Amino acid sequence: MNEKFEVTNIKLGVKNPNRANVFINHEFAFSLDLSQLVDFKIKLGSEFFKHDIEKFKHASDFGKLYQRMLEWTFVRPRSVREASDHLKIITARSKSDYVRTSQELKADVMERLISKGYLDDEKFAKYYVENRFTKKGISKKRLKLELFKKGVDNSIVDAVLNEGIRSDEEEIKKIIMKKRARYDDEKLISYLVRQGFDFELARNLVQASSETD
């Protein structure tokens, strides 16, 4: 006969009163959100089998990890790869063997973040293109390379860049305004090419700016 385990105490969290610490057979077992207690029908005196307890512990670890990741994504939009890498870092630091090693737990957290729309590479790419070096100036080529390094698919990057949010011509003009006093035409063109701009476009705009000086 399978052994049952009794819920002998439930205490509200001190740091987070919306979370409760659950004690099984007078020993701390796990913590859950209050809504999870209701969903799982956990109350004082409830009895559960071992597989139930394991399910609750998974839900507990999932809830804490998901909340941490959620708060992290609220700081600014993130790419799916950025989130996956960050998740690996914080789970590797966990004191829990289960959290450190469970691929299922990590996959569940990522799946929830994506399904709820908190991770969306297209939205991230648009945010990145709209906000990266807006005053300093940046080439489409460099934006594409940076987004590739963040794990965004090239098809998504191309689609976003083709929306015309940023144009190389306008970006070059920004850089010329900032760098003109320090560089002659040749050095300024070389600098622009190193930044990923087309040589012909850079040369034409630099020469045009010289004529108007």
Over which residues does each language-model region extend?
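An alpha-helical, amphipathic repeat domain used for nucleic-acid recognition
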Residues: 1-213
